[in-house]
Amino acid sequence: MGGDCISSIGICDISDKVTARWEFEENQIAYPWAYDALPEVDVVKPEDLFKCDVFVFVASKGIPPVGSGVKDVRMYQFENNSKIVAQYARQARTEHFKGLFAVVSDPVDPLAKTAWLESNKDENGVFDLKGLRPEQVQGFGLGVMNCARGLLCEARRTIFHSF
């Protein structure tokens, strides 16, 4: 389950307490009698984030509280999360990262696009294509939007079939 081809999983957070907790908890996950089947989980310093083959962006600034009046949660998330992903994309550029930059945080597609665009701007904000290549940036959605659209289509199909 990864232990044979993944040497370790690195985690990083702005809080040392969070990373210590994650490292402790994740290293307790194992299969009975196959304790080395899963890769070790290690804390990685921010300056070492891109010394890897795959960087997975799963950070989030959060979601608006219920009743806040925010109509489009995805755009609220994008406004906040795009600033975070841009920072890491610029770091990937600076460090000449050659691996996969995977985006899992919502909204996946706009954040993946932001990562690619921001990595390809110089220090003056000029777009120069000297950052991540398009094929290096991949969005990995959790299927939530697809499922929501599927439910909506099913509901509409049911309504139209009732006539």
Labelled PLM ranges:
Residues 125-128, 136-163:
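Substrate/ligand-engaging "lid" and interaction regions
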Residues 2-8:
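Conserved S-adenosyl-L-methionine
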Residues 15-17, 103-114, 141-146:
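Gly/Ser/Thr-rich loops at beta-strand to alpha-helix junctions
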Residues 108-132:
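Short, electropositive alpha-helical surface patch
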Residues 36-100:
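Rossmann-like NAD(P)-binding element
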Residues 32-42, 124-136:
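Short mixed-charge
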Residues 9, 101-102, 137:
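Hydrophobic/aromatic residues located in beta-strands of well-ordered beta-sheets
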Residues 8, 12-52:
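Conserved N-terminal Rossmann-fold NAD(P) cofactor-binding segment
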